[in-house]
Amino acid sequence: MTDELCFASATWLAEAIRTRRISSLEAVDACLARIEEVNPRINAVVRLTDDARERAGQADEDLAAGTVRGPLHGVPFTLKDSLDTAGVVTTAGTIGWRDRVPDRDATVVTRLKAAGAILLGKTNTPEFTWSDETDNDVFGRTSNPYDLSRTPGGSSGGPAAIVAAGGAPFDIGSDTGDSIRQPAHVCGIAGLKPTSGRVPRTGHWPGHQGLFESFTQLGPMARRVEDLTLLLPILAGPDGEDPHVAPVALGDPSIVAVDELRVVSFTDNGIRTPTPETVVAVEAATSALAAAGVRLRTEVPPGLDEAWATLDGLIRADGFAWLHRLIEAAGTPGWGSYATRDWITPGVPLPGDELTALIERADAIRARLLRWLADVDLIVCPAMPQPAIRHGESSASWFGDTYSDVHNLTGWPAVVVRGGTLPDGLPIGVQLIAPPWREDIALAGAHIVEAASGGWQAPDL
């Protein structure tokens, strides 16, 4: 029963708790036992809350009295340590905040708790989320549950690793440059980067950092696509603080007319050649969609190399002065962790006229891609060109991010779902990208791919 609960979807757990087939306390205890079992090897959970079992007991009492708090009543979850939690230490992976205790929850945490979810603990992140290797000087390095010598990705590597390992049914990640999608890919789970402006970032660090933060979106990470669908409506919508969030209605993936979808697929973006196994996974995904009746064509969206270079230029535009300021304000000695030092030390701010030209180019690229998107409903492509790399090789993979980073510039929603598995057990993710505000289409497509591939598989830990 413990394994069944550890590996169940959040959707299944919510229904089982609500119908009293299982108790919330049983679900919480199963997750805590699994964390105790696997965390010494993967180092994904950096802190447990003191009151998870108490809250689970209260959830069970409420249910017995006929009170259902919301769609996640009694369901446990973990949370990336870049998101504030009232009364629970939030470090964002920086030494200066080792003992920092926020006095309020991030908006997404408030919404999850209001929906009845129970916080188990916090998961590891690189310092201020800025690395594709989940490592920091506070808690150390997180490892991939499918191969401990490999990275779980970043920056949401802690969330991806513990969800994949069965320690929590879901977590909330952040994605500035594929930081939900890359870890979902290498850890074999499902992850959603919503449309930019869909989910409030209030209470997430690095915080309001201008151009850098404008590319960031928060989203759910889970073992099953159905859980992304369950969680998005809970997270989405204005909170009266994040000035970039719009009150746009969500579509329902279950009523998407799949046989009317115009789907474009490609396996090679012309920047980084994917492995043969990655090509096979994407082709299998497109075959599954074709069998479902979509109208399919092969084409690479125009100007992906320019789009990626423009995003990279904008992120580097101030020479990472924003990161240096944050590290100083946090009281972290020196230049922060090795990962952030790699970014800060070579940074040279752009002159104003060059920055203006870069912003203009970004808007021109967005406009061109939107015009191209006029007769496209869904894009299917690699999440990354290779599976999880070994620890310490992160910088070598940077151009691999070109498959996913582009959509931090466009702001389009994207889902990654497990589409294949290497002979050694390493997962391969497939990415599905939809037009702005059409998460329903991306999720509907991901559900088809998941059904064909089998989706998440338990690691042999």
Each predicted region: which residue ranges?
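An N-terminal boundary/leader segment
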Residues: 1-54, 291-293, 349, 458-461
